[in-house]
């Protein structure tokens, strides 16, 4: 499971790579883990079309949300707090049928989660070694995700998101990571040229075409060194 990732390092990357403005929220941290705030990119409509004119083009917006999806059927904020840490990764193969993710998938609530790298454990030594996975060229990744909006009976509102994953059993790099004996998974990293097509896919089955493993030669993995305590 990929439950921790690193946000973008520089504001200009949001505009240059993802065509959105950088977040104005200065409280966002560089590391994101379950129930922490992060950002995602989704489509927003410019407005209703006027008769006789072309329909408005979809524009992108950057949204701050909680990492860990909160399905709309959750009964209370307390229930959401318990469930969301377990709902950070959605299997692409079952997103359309899962009770947790079906509404977002079928409702075209697709998003892109920008990140510099994500963390996974390497268990080949017999113990978990946190490892940083990034692009070889150092550019940001755009990971396919789903978003949701939950409204509580007391007026509470939680905007949340999760990351989609694909099978990595035969992936030249990512098959090394994850618990021994378990299916290997990796995040659904999108090609840069596919960002718009993913967000604008006309129906769920078309969106499924983007659920592919990113090429191993485009990724690099390095163990994360533990910080030494000050003398």
Give the location of each predicted region.
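Short linear sequence motif anchored by a di-proline
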Residues: 1-231
């Amino acid at each position: 499971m990929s439950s921790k990732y690193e946000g973008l390092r520089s504001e200009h990357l949001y505009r240059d790579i993802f065509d959105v403005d950088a977040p104005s929220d200065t409280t966002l941290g560089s590391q994101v883990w379950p129930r922490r705030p992060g950002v995602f990119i989704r489509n927003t409509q410019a407005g209703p079309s006027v008769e006789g004119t072309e329909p408005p083009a979809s524009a992108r917006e950057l949204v701050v949300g909680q990492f860990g999806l909160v399905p709309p059927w959750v009964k209370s904020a307390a229930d959401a707090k318990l469930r969301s840490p377990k709902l950070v990764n959605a299997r692409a193969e079952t997103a359309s049928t899962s009770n947790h993710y079906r509404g977002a998938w079928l409702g075209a609530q697709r998003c892109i989660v920008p990140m510099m790298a994500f963390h996974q454990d390497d268990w080949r030594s017999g113990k978990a070694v946190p490892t940083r996975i990034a692009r070889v060229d150092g550019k940001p990744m755009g990971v396919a995700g789903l978003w949701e909006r939950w409204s509580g009976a007391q007026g509470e509102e939680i905007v949340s998101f999760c990351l989609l994953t694909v099978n990595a059993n035969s992936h030249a790099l990512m098959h090394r990571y994850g618990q021994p004996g378990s299916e290997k998974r990796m995040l659904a990293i999108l090609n840069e040229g596919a960002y718009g097509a993913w967000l604008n896919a006309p129906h769920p089955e078309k969106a499924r075409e983007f659920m592919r493993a990113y090429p191993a030669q485009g990724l690099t993995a390095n163990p994360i060194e533990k910080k030494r305590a000050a003398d």
